[in-house]
Amino acid sequence: AVMGIYDGQGTFEGTDRLSMAVNKDFLSYLEAKCKGENPRHIVFEGDRLFSATNLRYILDKYQTRICILKQSEEALHKRHMARGDTQSEKFLKGRKTKIDNIQKEFSGNSEIFWLNEISDTKSLSGKLWRWLSEDTL
C-alpha cells in the first residue's frame, strides 16, 4: 500500500495532502494490516506519517526499512526556489530538527540517502523497486 494522495494537483502531494489528524487512522490501518494476510510493503513518506511514534509502532510490528532522504543546503534551496513554495524558515528548521531527532533515535534501523542529483533519485528508485519486487528488506 502506498500512503498519500498522488493526483498531480498542487505543489505538495503524498501524505502532505492528508489531514493533520491522520495518525490515528494510520495506526488503525497498520494494526488491521498486521493481523491480516500479506502484511508487508507499506510505503509512506512525508511529515504527516514520518514520526517517531509511528516508527516505533512499525518497528515493533513489522520488518522495517527506514530511509531518510537528505540534500545539501544548496540543492534544497534550489528545489524550494524552483517550485516556488512559501514554507517559512521556521517551518523548514522545524522539519530539519524533527528529521535529525528521528535519525538519532533510529540510527540502528535507518539508512541515509543523499539526493542531490537526479541520478541519486533514480538510483534510490531502483533500490526501492528491487526491495519491493524481490520481497527483501
PLM-predicted stretches and their roles:
Residues 104-137:
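NTP-dependent small-molecule kinase module
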Residues 45-46, 60-80:
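Conserved phosphate-donor/acceptor-positioning beta-strand/loop module used by diverse small-molecule
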Residues 55-65, 131-133:
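Short, surface-exposed basic-aromatic patches at helix termini and helix-loop junctions that form
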Residues 19-31, 51-54, 85-101, 125-130:
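Well-ordered, non-membrane alpha-helical segments in soluble/globular domains
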Residues 2, 64-68, 112-114:
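Conserved beta-strand scaffold positions in the cores of enzyme catalytic domains, especially
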Residues 4-7, 70, 116-118:
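Residues at the C-termini of beta-strands that transition into short coil/loop
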Residues 33, 37, 58, 105-106:
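Hydrophobic helix-cap positions at the C-terminus of alpha-helices
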